[in-house]
Design a protein with these regions (language model features):
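C-terminal regulatory/interaction module of P-loop NTP-utilizing enzymes
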Residues: 1-324
Length: 324
């Protein structure tokens, strides 16, 4: 993924400006012109109510990966729901947000957990001025408004809770609200689920639910894309350390893959945070401890992580040598 050089999310920029920036960036990345044309036709055919426009994401990053983009766009244009499966730091949530922005649809982020139940998704009765009133949940609102529902870490919830999504995600495209009416999904509604397979606290998705998604296995970020990300985030970072930090992340990834360290240290956000700390004057050693090393609480593992870091980045490195 790469950063869109401050073109997104500024209050003084109009929606169409950053949306056109996104589409132009996708063209530059070689995404199929036919798919991009179809997305623009989709937006034109499905105008959005003014009240919902603040819900259209204004991403700070754009996901980088032509093949994944083309698969995702084609699936959504065909009316499919997406399941983005992959390890840590593969850009699942970034891509989900980007897709909602590209299609110009309002997004509802739904974070799953072990205590999630049907009422959390669809809605529940509540009191308003002494009267029992139905308070719609995020899935209900998404269905009504033709939004994109981002089902974050869908395999954290119990399968019993997820059963309410079956009719939403298959050909019926409807929600039966107990005690109320049956709600058909708006034509524009799509759901994009994300999951990390095999993490603590996660469960196997049952076959019935999985069959309702088109599944994309998210690839790990490459050295080239890491360097693009670092240059976009830190334009003044020297070429030498752009390369070294990219290799550091890949070294940590290899250690995780071989089970020498846990995935706690494989934290791209943490690396970027550490670089921001270094820019503020914190030396590389303490900054990388805060951003990466200390996220593993075992002292032996911390030692292994520090050894990996020391092979690439001197602990005494300061901002004067790191940035131009």
């Amino acid at each position: 993924m790469i950063r869109l050089k401050n073109r997104f999310g500024k209050a003084n920029r109009k929606e169409m400006s950053w949306m056109s920036d996104l589409m132009e960036t996708l063209r530059q990345e070689g995404i199929s012109p036919d798919l991009l044309c179809a997305v623009e036709e989709y937006r034109a055919a499905h105008p959005l109510a003014e009240a919902l426009r603040p819900r259209i994401p204004a991403p700070a990053f754009v996901y980088y990966g032509r093949e994944v983009w083309e698969q995702a766009l084609a699936a959504l244009l065909c009316g499919e729901n997406l399941l983005l499966a992959g390890g840590k730091a593969t850009g699942k949530n970034v891509l989900a947000e980007n897709l909602a922005a590209a299609f110009g649809r309002p997004a509802w982020d739904i974070s799953f957990h072990v205590n999630m139940d049907a009422a959390s998704l669809i809605g529940m009765d509540t009191f308003v001025d002494g009267t029992v009133t139905f308070r719609p949940g995020p899935v209900y609102r998404c269905a009504q408004c033709g939004g994109f529902g981002v089902l974050d870490e869908i395999n954290m919830a119990k399968n019993e809770a997820l059963a309410v999504l079956h009719a939403v995600l298959d050909f019926r495209r409807a929600i039966d609200v107990p005690g109320y009416e049956r709600i058909p999904l708006a034509e524009e509604t799509r759901f994009i689920a994300t999951m990390n397979y095999g993490y603590a606290g996660t469960r196997e998705l049952n076959e019935a639910l999985t069959s309702r998604f088109a599944v994309i296995q998210m690839p790990t970020i490459t050295e080239e894309n890491l360097e693009k990300l670092l240059r976009a985030q830190f334009a003044d970072l020297t070429d030498k350390y752009v390369h070294q930090f990219a290799l550091l992340f890949l070294d940590l990834q290899k250690k995780c893959d071989s089970a020498e360290i846990s995935t706690k240290a494989l934290d791209l956000r943490g690396m970027l945070d550490a670089l921001r700390l270094m820019r503020r004057g914190v030396a590389a050693g303490p900054a990388l401890d805060m951003g990466i090393t200390n996220k593993a609480f075992d002292s032996y593992e911390q030692g292994l992580i520090r050894d990996v870091i020391a092979a690439r980045i001197p602990a005494s490195l300061t901002a004067e040598k790191l940035f131009r």
